[in-house]
Amino acid sequence: MIYVMAAITANDGQREELIEAFRAILPAVRAKAGCLEYGLSIHLESGLEGQAPYNENVVTIVEKWVDLDALKAHINDHQYQDWFEQVWPLMADASMQILTAID
């Protein structure tokens, strides 16, 4: 099982546009072979100690894939790459953690 936590920081004032761009591809990504979960999240001010600082511009994509090959197929898909190039100007920063289950 592969988990992905992709933190995307939108340019100031462009978070909603970025969210809408991701919502547009949700059905296609969720239909891909090996995709078990693909969802959008935003920061929640919880007041809990240890939480990362709140940033209203961050959109986090939470993904679950059956294996690394399925994730690679998604990332290397030409339609996804074309879409990503179109939304890249909305992004100030992006980082991705790729995790594997150990239990």
Where are these regions (language model features)?
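Active-site acidic-Proline motif in GNAT/NAT acetyltransferases
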Residues: 11-12, 69
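Carbohydrate-binding/catalytic loop surfaces
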Residues: 44-47
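Absolute protein N-terminus
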Residues: 1-2, 103
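Short, conserved charged micro-motifs
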Residues: 13-18
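An amphipathic, aromatic/His-enriched active-site/gating alpha helix that lines ligand/cofactor pockets
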Residues: 24-36, 55-98
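Active-site-flanking beta-strand signature of metal-NTP-handling nucleotidyl enzymes
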Residues: 3-8
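Short glycine-biased active-site loop of nucleotidyltransferases that positions the nucleotide triphosphate
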Residues: 49-54
